[in-house]
């Protein structure tokens, strides 16, 4: 049997419509999770810039949810999160600041920026020493967590101690205009209470890798295709990504999952 490109596009769009209840259920599961990770990346729809937002949750029934929006504003993140009130893992993009709940910022991003700072100022012992001192905070936290399980009270005490040390490192340079360490020092102060939640909460990741991995296929397809041509195309692309990435994360057979959806006739669109 031969299928034209148009026929394939129509089938995929109908499949996306047919699975709307499944995707709504996945979003509800994500919002009910105690932990969620978010990230965003650029996407073009009909030549216009927009963003794909990725929402990922851990646990035995993980969720991977993709959403396209023309905007990269923080309101998109809060709308997508809905009534979520758990710990949100993200990078340091200001759009996530609108979330009023508990936050864990990504240490992978901070460590990369510290490494760049050291490389750019390798001959400045003060800069290198400061960056290494911030890195030691992370290493100390991980070393403590790699040992025997800590009681909740001890985890809280450790987190407070690390936050206090981060504050002292931050205030050292935050007021010195033009100093190489100033930007990251201000970041430490701005997010002082969002750097060591992973110490307080067992199982909470210190990085945002789950959301970043979710968006990697989006980045690859963007480079190959340039994006989508219409709103229908974007909706279909996000629907397929949500389902297939969730099935993959749960170790499910995508072919069997598709068959269960296609057991009933696809709707006309």
Tell me the role of every PLM-derived stretch:
Residues 1-269:
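Catalytic center-proximal scaffold of phosphoryl-transfer enzymes
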